[in-house]
């Protein structure tokens, strides 16, 4: 099994993701090869919480061009993790 910190890359901080935090839904950018079970186990291991559901979205790389050179940006994979109602919250920000 992979190390949990290799599966979870970073939290996604957007206006929509901060609104979802009130519903105990947290958004993370994850490894493109990780599946839902690996994401669930990694979140539970890193943060010590109980995960109820994991939704995953794939993003293709965007076409970019610099002068005569062209290519694609890296593809991404985003996971929205829903915690159980009795689980503690994840502290992403230090207040």
From Swiss-Prot:
GO biological process per UniProt: translation
Name the GO cellular-component terms: ribonucleoprotein complex; ribosome
Q: Which InterPro entries match?
A: Nucleotide-bd_a/b_plait_sf, Ribosomal_uL23-like, Ribosomal_uL23/eL15/eS24_sf, Ribosomal_uL23_CS
Q: Which domain of life is it from?
A: Bacteria
For this UniProt record, the keywords arranged alphabetically read as follows: Ribonucleoprotein, Ribosomal protein, RNA-binding, rRNA-binding
Q: Which SUPFAM superfamilies match?
A: Ribosomal proteins S24e, L23 and L15e
One GO molecular-function annotation for this sequence?
A: structural constituent of ribosome
Q: How does it assemble?
A: Part of the 50S ribosomal subunit. Contacts protein L29, and trigger factor when it is bound to the ribosome.
Protein purpose: One of the early assembly proteins it binds 23S rRNA. One of the proteins that surrounds the polypeptide exit tunnel on the outside of the ribosome. Forms the main docking site for trigger factor binding to the ribosome.
> Would you identify the family this protein belongs to, as annotated?
Belongs to the universal ribosomal protein uL23 family.
The protein's name: Large ribosomal subunit protein uL23
Its organism's taxonomic lineage begins at:
Bacteria, Bacillati, Bacillota, Bacilli, Bacillales
